[in-house]
UniProtKB/Swiss-Prot annotation:
The keyword Calcium does not apply. It catalyses: an N-(acyl)-sphingosylphosphocholine = an N-(acyl)-sphingosyl-1,3-cyclic phosphate + choline; an N-(acyl)-sphingosylphosphoethanolamine = an N-(acyl)-sphingosyl-1,3-cyclic phosphate + ethanolamine; a 1-acyl-sn-glycero-3-phosphocholine = a 1-acyl-sn-glycero-2,3-cyclic phosphate + choline; a 1-acyl-sn-glycero-3-phosphoethanolamine = a 1-acyl-sn-glycero-2,3-cyclic phosphate + ethanolamine. One of its GO terms (biological process) is lipid catabolic process. SUPFAM superfamilies: PLC-like phosphodiesterases. This is Dermonecrotic toxin SPH. The keyword DNA-binding does not apply. Belongs to the arthropod phospholipase D family. It comes from Ixodes scapularis. The active site is at H29, H65. Dermonecrotic toxins cleave the phosphodiester linkage between the phosphate and headgroup of certain phospholipids (sphingolipid and lysolipid substrates), forming an alcohol (often choline) and a cyclic phosphate. Acts on sphingomyelin (SM). It may also act on ceramide phosphoethanolamine (CPE), lysophosphatidylcholine (LPC) and lysophosphatidylethanolamine (LPE), but not on lysophosphatidylserine (LPS), and lysophosphatidylglycerol (LPG). It acts by transphosphatidylation, releasing exclusively cyclic phosphate products as second products. Its cofactor is Mg(2+). The lineage of its organism: Eukaryota, Metazoa, Ecdysozoa, Arthropoda, Chelicerata. InterPro entries: PLC-like_Pdiesterase_TIM-brl. It comes from the Eukaryota.
Length: 364
């Protein structure tokens, strides 16, 4: 009887202590040089977005955005793609790596829409090969970096096909797909993106964004963002969206408004502003920064505040646009990663099914 009472008490404490706030991803925008990785992480990001430039034949060359880019940003920062992946592997991939618990997701904006059609499959093959050989190779399974492969348009589907086929070729066990997600980033119609995923046989790990450059984001209609959130929050067959993000958001008023809508992530040039808003009384009871314990592919439905449906006709005030990037780096406390307690379907097999895996069993 005493043992039963103790067990019931322990279960009650576990349920009571469970944190049901939405895990939120603060994605640093245009992190295209190696020094910028640590800069953005020290400023509060838990994910980074990088732009990948390809040669005409589909070879991934470097991280680079170029002109034009966001207001008040330098557009020409870059790094060799292999050096970039190896750096991230070194600072995240092992138990006592400097950012092993801080950097949760690398969002790769694959600049492939202008490639010749015959080069798009090759681009997927090449970026996946470089990920396997230079980011994931030799890294323990639970420490492997999560990567979001973002193409511009649904018409770029061949890139994802090439990447998927290549990863399967390297890893017939399909375990690496637990660390891979997908996105279509340039505001295509959602129904077209849904059809693309159906053709690919992908039914999990799908992020979906909406937005525009920070120079114009305050003029953008919220209708597509609302539609994207509704895709996540319904269970219809075409409702493919697992995570919703908005880009590129720098002003505090717009950050607040976007979080009220129930997004899972914001891409920003000003991460300290986003983390500051997350600490405000209105939000800190319902939203929190994501940690390594959170599954970046898990779908969570909206819990908007009472102000979540307010009118959007008001324009955001001009905030302080002083740079946040003049600072002295400081050391971050280190502690080992631990495995996630559960995992959602992650792997496409040859029958276009993404099987469930037992989270208690090793994947390697």
């Amino acid at each position: 009887m005493i043992r039963i009472f103790a067990l019931i008490t322990a279960l009650a404490i576990t349920v009571k202590c469970q944190d049901d706030r939405r895990p939120f991803y603060v994605i640093g925008h245009m992190v295209n040089s190696i020094p910028q990785v640590s800069q953005f992480l020290e400023l509060g990001t838990n994910a980074i977005e990088s732009d990948v430039e390809f040669s005409e034949n589909g070879t991934a060359l470097r991280t680079f955005h170029g002109l034009p880019c966001d207001c008040l940003r330098r557009c020409k920062e870059s790094a060799d793609i292999v050096d970039y992946f190896q750096y991230i592997r070194n600072v995240t991939g092992f138990r006592h790596s400097e950012y092993s618990e801080k950097l949760l997701l690398v969002f790769l904006d694959l600049k492939v829409s202008k490639l010749p059609p015959e080069s798009k499959y090759a681009a997927g093959v090449d970026i996946a090969t470089k990920l396997v050989l230079h980011l994931w190779d030799g890294v323990p399974f639970y420490d492997a970096m999560n990567v979001l492969l973002s193409i511009g348009r649904a018409s770029d589907m061949a890139v994802l096909t090439g990447a998927i086929d290549t990863i399967i070729g390297f890893d017939p066990s399909l375990s690496l797909f637990n660390h891979v997600g997908f996105d279509v980033g340039l505001n295509d119609k959602l129904e077209n993106i849904a059809k693309m995923y159906e053709r690919l046989g992908v039914n999990g790990h799908r992020w979906q964004g909406d937005g525009i450059t920070n120079c114009l984001v305050n003029l953008r209609s919220p209708l597509r963002l609302k539609e994207t959130i509704s895709y996540r929050d319904t269970n219809k067959r075409e409702s493919y969206v697992d995570k919703v993000y908005y880009w590129t958001v720098d002003k505090v008023a717009t950050i607040r408004k976007t979080i009220r809508r129930g997004v899972d992530a914001i891409i920003t040039n000003r991460p300290k502003r986003v983390t500051g808003v997350l600490e405000e009384d209105e939000f800190k009871k319902t939203v929190r920064p994501a940690t390594y314990r959170d599954d970046p592919w898990m779908r969570l439905q909206s819990k908007t505040t009472g102000r979540g449906n307010e009118l959007d006709s008001d324009m955001d005030e001009m905030g302080d646009e002083a740079s946040e990037f003049d600072f002295e780096p400081f050391s971050y406390p280190l502690s080992p990663r631990r495995p996630l307690s559960s995992r959602s379907p992650a792997i496409r097999d040859s029958y276009n099914v993404w099987p469930q895996y037992n989270p208690l069993s090793p994947f390697y």
